[in-house]
């Protein structure tokens, strides 16, 4: 292992932001970039009237609706560290894409709307993080508005999300009376002033909770703050780094992302406490981040990041070694060597050629159709990284087009969108219509919009009488052939060439499983594994 690789790995922090829709996640992403100096001015999320859009929301449908649908990747430097920030889709229909992004990070920042508390999508996403014991930092947002009681919010996080809370800052008031926060570990009070353009050095600081200046500044609030802090210190958990790294305890910060308040404390905590890249599971062995040889896996494919170029980019998480532009690397699933000369790094949809990258970094490989989600790359060693699943879709539509002459464009568009993971595409073994599967209705809207904008195809989706899908496999090829013959009307091939059973209802699926005990019905499948 070289000292250079070890030093670079220690400098890396790779994290995702997770939240329920409208908790302020995209605003927070903007402000983190602003505070790090990566951008000069924050775009206004949902800025339909001003025409300003968030830096991380770039697809047409996102600009129209003010939601993050695709996951953006942004790299920036802060305090001598390289930070890779993955902005995940906040809309609940995109849990599958979000899950895949969470396989590529080492920690997560959870944003909670303090007026609403823990919401459904937050629960789902935290459960995904828990599968990998991902360390979580929590930000209670929107204290410039009327919000719920802060102690109640902590109790709710502990009860519902089953993770212990350690408050690091504590709010002084809320809404019109929001005065700032007290930093418990530093014994400092940061004074709040409204306004979205302020940078960290522009907020006032008072040292010490017993400083006489506090009585003069806010005589009504200071005694309440002291009482609350006494209560919090008696009733809450102290911050413990080992428990945080094990995913058992979350440090909690309070603030207002839209006013840039509380942002620097979060950034500092991610640099000081969040883990550097960790070893990764592959089928043959664990792969350490400081190993000399390059390796990585694809967790996302995005079509048409630049509609002018009709391109597709495969997002690769570097797991070990050092990537250098022009190096030879092996695409292991198809056993093909590629020269990595046009690999890029990201600042949302602004791209630059990547000269080098280390474990934790995200690089983009131009994809002409050969790369799939879950594929592994190395300098030659046969590694297959694990833990990137497809989920059985819950909603289904059949697809037809208004102009039959555009069938080729439809097929190409759906194949690309299917590989990207925006939607699952099934080709029934009998019947001409393609079937789309998704985990939420918005995915169909996104596909309709992207087929029209990027492929010039007007598609019509009709409801399909399918309740659920299961991938099927059997070691006995003869029995599998019998099963295929007997159930041809319910079988389809997915974009990865895997056989799937499309069940019209729960009873049908149960009966079919009983009749065919040798056939295995899978609710998930690994991306890189053909059943």
UniProtKB/Swiss-Prot annotation:
* Stretches that traverse the bilayer: none
InterPro entries per record: EF-G-like_DII, EFG_III/V, G_TR_CS, P-loop_NTPase, PrfC, RF3_C, RF3_dom_3_sf, RF3_GTP-bd
Report the locations given in the UniProt record.
Cytoplasm
Which GO terms of type biological process are on file? regulation of translational termination
Q: Which residues form a coiled coil?
A: none
Native organism: Neisseria gonorrhoeae (strain NCCP11945)
Annotated GTP binding sites = 19-26, 87-91, 141-144
Q: What is this protein called?
A: Peptide chain release factor 3
Q: Does the keyword Cytoplasm apply?
A: yes
């Amino acid at each position: 292992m070289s000292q250079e690789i070890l030093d670079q790995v220690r400098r890396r922090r790779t994290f995702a932001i997770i939240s329920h829709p409208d908790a302020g996640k995209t605003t927070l992403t903007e402000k983190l970039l602003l505070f790090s100096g990566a951008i000069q001015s924050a775009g206004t999320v949902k800025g339909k009237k001003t025409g300003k859009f968030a830096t991380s929301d770039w697809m047409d449908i996102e600009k129209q609706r003010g939601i993050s649908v695709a996951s953006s990747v942004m790299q920036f430097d802060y305090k001598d560290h390289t930070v890779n920030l993955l902005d995940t889709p906040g809309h609940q229909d995109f849990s599958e894409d979000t899950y895949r992004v969470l396989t590529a990070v080492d920690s997560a920042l959870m944003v909670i709307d303090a007026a609403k508390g823990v919401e459904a999508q937050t629960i789902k996403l935290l459960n995904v993080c828990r599968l990998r014991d991902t360390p979580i930092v929590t930000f209670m947002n929107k204290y410039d508005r009327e919000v719920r009681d802060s102690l109640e919010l902590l109790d709710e996080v502990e009860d519902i999300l089953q993770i212990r809370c350690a408050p690091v800052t504590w709010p002084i008031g809320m809404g019109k009376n929001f005065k700032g926060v007290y930093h418990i570990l530093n014994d400092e009070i940061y004074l709040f002033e409204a306004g979205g353009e302020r940078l960290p050095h522009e907020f006032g600081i008072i040292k010490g909770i017993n400083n006489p200046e506090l009585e003069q500044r806010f005589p009504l609030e200071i005694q309440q703050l002291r009482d609350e802090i006494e209560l919090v210190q008696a009733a809450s958990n102290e911050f413990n780094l080992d428990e945080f790294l094990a995913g058992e305890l979350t440090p909690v910060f309070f603030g207002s992302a839209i006013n840039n308040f509380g942002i620097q404390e979060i950034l500092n905590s991610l640099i000081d406490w969040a883990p550097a890249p960790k070893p990764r599971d592959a089928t043959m062995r664990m792969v350490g981040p400081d190993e000399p040889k390059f390796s990585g896996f694809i967790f996302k494919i995005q079509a048409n990041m630049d509609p002018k170029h009709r391109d597709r980019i495969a997002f690769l998480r570097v797991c070990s070694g050092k990537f250098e532009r022009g190096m030879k690397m092996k695409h292991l699933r198809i056993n093909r060597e590629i020269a990595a000369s046009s690999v890029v790094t990201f600042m949302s949809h602004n791209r630059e050629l990547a000269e080098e990258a280390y474990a934790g970094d995200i690089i983009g490989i131009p994809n002409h159709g050969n790369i799939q989600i879950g594929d592994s790359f190395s300098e030659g060693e046969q590694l297959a990284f694990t833990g990137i699943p497809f989920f059985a879709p819950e909603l289904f539509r059949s697809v037809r087009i208004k102009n039959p002459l555009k069938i080729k464009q439809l097929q190409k568009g759906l194949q690309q969108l299917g590989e990207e993971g925006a939607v699952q595409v099934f080709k029934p073994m009998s019947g001409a219509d393609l079937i789309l599967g998704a985990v939420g209705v918005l995915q169909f809207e996104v596909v309709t919009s992207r087929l029209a904008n990027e492929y010039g195809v007007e598609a019509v989706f009709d409801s399909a009488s399918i309740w659920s899908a299961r991938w099927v496999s059997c070691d006995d090829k003869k029995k599998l052939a019998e099963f295929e013959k007997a159930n041809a009307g319910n079988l389809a091939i997915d974009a990865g060439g895997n056989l799937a059973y499309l069940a019209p209802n729960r009873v049908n699926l149960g009966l079919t499983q009983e009749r065919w005990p040798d056939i295995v019905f899978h609710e998930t499948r690994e991306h890189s594994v053909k059943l």
